[in-house]
């Protein structure tokens, strides 16, 4: 189990993200850090960087352990000798090679219309977010060392939206999650294919940030892919059955919501390899599969009048939010799918 989860699960009624930095000296960045995650992605403020190359995934099938930590469902890739691994190269982390270590799933309460993604796009929160966390194996021997070291980690974020069918590998995880409804339960994943969780796109946005769990180390290069993958409402409800307790209780303690509140950019640049001008002229504004183009890179007052899922989830521009003071539910209450 990840060390912070052990402590966080001991005091579930006391510990919250706002207090992490006060609980342990190694967690001080959770309060004092100026490059914290997650953040809101403002499409109008993205900086196009033509030098950002596509992300490359090397490797295919691995063995992994799927665990209910009491805070999050986490897939940890087994580091076995003479067994395949998943390496990530290219993108903003060149020339380094990053080795996939774990995958976490963040989600909201589906039956209450709550969204669960950690990152938001134009103040819109999505139903779920999958995060693939890899460490710099070119510089560091393992995840623990890399976690506290410069250029140590790469986080690839996949937005999950509601669709008519669930993406195949996500469906497999959904089925497996039914066997780990309670804290501490685990199940083995054989022939697990992490790359199948990624959408078919070479476009992304990227920024320098932190882990979204204690100790919030500011050693993470974030890559948020431009297209979502999909999950049905019924399958999302299955994830909602996961609980924080070790056994069934008279009053269930569900895992949701499972995301950290938004943090300020504090002047950080958010770069993209999407040529905004080119996209606006070649991509239909009604394209449902593109997260950022659908949201609009430039101010577009007309989108508030559109009768689609995006406009229903959009926070009206008349409402002014400060990122650090926004409550988790403020974004999710913008509407439902």
UniProtKB/Swiss-Prot annotation:
Residues 17-274 form the Alpha-carbonic anhydrase domain. The active site is at residue 140. GO terms for cellular component: extracellular region. Its main location: secreted. It is found in: Secreted. CDD domains: alpha_CARP_X_XI_like (cd03121). PANTHER family: CARBONIC ANHYDRASE, CARBONIC ANHYDRASE XA-RELATED. This is Putative carbonic anhydrase-like protein 2. It comes from Caenorhabditis elegans.
């Amino acid at each position: 189990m990840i060390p912070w989860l052990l402590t966080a699960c001991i005091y579930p009624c006391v510990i919250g993200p706002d207090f992490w930095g006060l609980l342990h000296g190694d967690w001080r960045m959770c309060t004092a850090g100026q490059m914290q995650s997650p953040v809101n992605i403002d499409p109008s403020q993205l900086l196009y960087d033509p030098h950002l190359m596509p992300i490359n995934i090397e490797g295919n099938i691995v063995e992994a352990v799927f665990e209910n930590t009491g805070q999050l469902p986490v897939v940890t890739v087994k580091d076995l000798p003479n067994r395949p691994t998943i390496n990530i190269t290219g993108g903003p982390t060149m020339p380094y090679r990053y080795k996939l270590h774990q995958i976490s799933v963040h989600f909201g309460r589906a039956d209450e219309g709550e969204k669960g993604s950690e990152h938001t796009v134009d103040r819109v929160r999505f139903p779920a977010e999958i995060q693939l966390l890899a460490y710099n194996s070119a510089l560091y021997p393992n995840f623990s060392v890399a976690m506290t070291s410069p250029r140590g980690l790469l986080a690839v974020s996949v937005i999950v939206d509601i669709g008519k069918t669930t993406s195949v590998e996500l469906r497999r995880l959904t089925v497996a999650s039914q066997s780990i409804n309670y804290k501490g339960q685990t199940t083995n994943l054989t022939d697990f294919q992490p790359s199948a969780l990624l959408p078919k796109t070479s476009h992304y946005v990227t920024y320098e940030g932190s882990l979204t769990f204690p100790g919030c180390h500011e050693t993470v290069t974030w890559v948020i892919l431009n297209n979502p993958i999909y999950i049905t409402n019924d399958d999302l409800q299955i994830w909602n059955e996961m609980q924080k307790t070790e056994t069934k209780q008279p009053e269930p303690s569900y895992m949701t919501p499972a995301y950290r509140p938004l943090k300020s950019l504090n002047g950080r640049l958010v770069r993209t390899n999407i040529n905004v001008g080119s996209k606006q002229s070649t991509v239909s504004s009604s394209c449902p599969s593109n997260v950022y183009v659908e949201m609009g890179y430039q101010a577009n007052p007309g989108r508030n009048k559109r009768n689609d899922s995006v406009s229903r989830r959009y926070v009206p521009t008349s409402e002014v939010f400060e990122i650090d003071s926004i409550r988790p539910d403020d974004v999710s209450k913008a509407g439902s799918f």
